[in-house]
Amino acid sequence: MDYLDYFDIVDGKLLFSGGNISELSEKYGTPLIIYSRRIIERNVRELMNAFDKENFSLHYAMKANYNPAILSILRNKGVGIDAANLNEVLLALQTGFSKDKIIASPNNLPGNELKNIKETGVTINFDDISQFNMVAADPPETVSFRINPGIGKGEFEGTTTGGKGSKFGMPPEAALKAYETAIESGVHRFGIHMMTGSNVLDPEFFRESTRTFFSIASGISHKLGITFEFVDIGGGFGVPYRDNEESLDLGRTSNYIKENMKNYRDLFTENTKLIIEPGRYIVANSAVLISRVTCKKDYDRIMIGTDTGMNILIRPALYGAIHPIIPVNKFFNKKEERGDVVGPICENTDKIAKDISIQKLEPGDLIAILNAGAYVTSMSSNYNLQPKAMEILLDNREEYIIRERDELQDMLNNFIIPEHLKAIGMDRL
């Protein structure tokens, strides 16, 4: 994988999507997440072109990154939304997505939240019959259930969302009963859904999983005499994070899926829509996280201290995930060293990278952490009262702030001290 596809070097300066990283870091400070609208739109275009235009819908899994500016870019390109809960549905509506472009796929929600989602008019992929039963007295017009086809794949155990032991979806026999219950509740319009993995780079997995899923869906359709208005195969389209990984062959992947669709013509009527729900594939490589080296230790091993902690990038600590790191101002430095890249959080797990080889860095140097567009800001926190990163968007030679850096008061706004506990003269936190 060539990580430098999105970078240029002009007059010795490292540019990302046309933006001078050093200059932007000086202007806005670090940690700084820099997004490229051009890359987001190119990723959307690749997905759109890989599938037939008719009876196909691309929905973005907004859990990957819910920044409203990113959502607005996708809305303008005709992309729909895959939402995981009521707040995601409401944000999608607030950013201009019509209800018919939003599908909610919640998991283990309380009844009042499910009812509120239903009241918005968006389509719901019910994770279980128990979830549907919460609204069965007044069911939505269209009902879809999430199937666990017994197949799952993920970069890590925690990101595998199908197969044995997964908390998501229903086995085929339970799904059949769920659709029977929906019919008995007066429902006449149906969809069907699965989501089995995350960051999958092997086209063969999509071949196997969709073949199995289509077979299950076809069986339900035949046994109950129903047709599906949409068949939603979820996401899982991966991007490489390691040097030895190849990019997902999207053409081969889509051909496998379309081949399976042809083999199940009874399932895919002329009015049946295929839906995919990628998140990472659309936004991961659209952003870099810029961090500044703050200090350096060289005792039993080299520790490169930075101003980016696990509160901003949790994936390495949570999953053992790897994010490629390149030096910004030492790009041509021939001297390399091995060490850990660490942050300012009071945890020994606060390591952005372990035992990596990188050009020799000193305090004040900048590094770029790649694939920062997905599951970075959406999983960030204010642990240790550390601020989340500022975010900017590069758009047609202009730059826009799309998230301000946290100030202390921003992090304290929802806390309330009872009057009798306040310090003398204290009027606010």
Residue map of PLM features:
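A charged N-terminal "starter" segment
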Residues: M1-E141, A182-E184, H188, H222, ...
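Conserved, mostly hydrophobic/aromatic
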Residues: I40, K63, N85, I117, ...
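Active-site-proximal loop/turn and secondary-structure-junction residues that shape catalytic pockets
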Residues: A64-Y66, N87-E88, N108-P110, D128-S130, ...
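Structured core elements
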Residues: G80-D82, I103, T123-N125, S144-R146, ...
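Glycine-rich, aromatic-flanked loop segments that form ligand/cofactor-binding clefts
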Residues: P140-G152
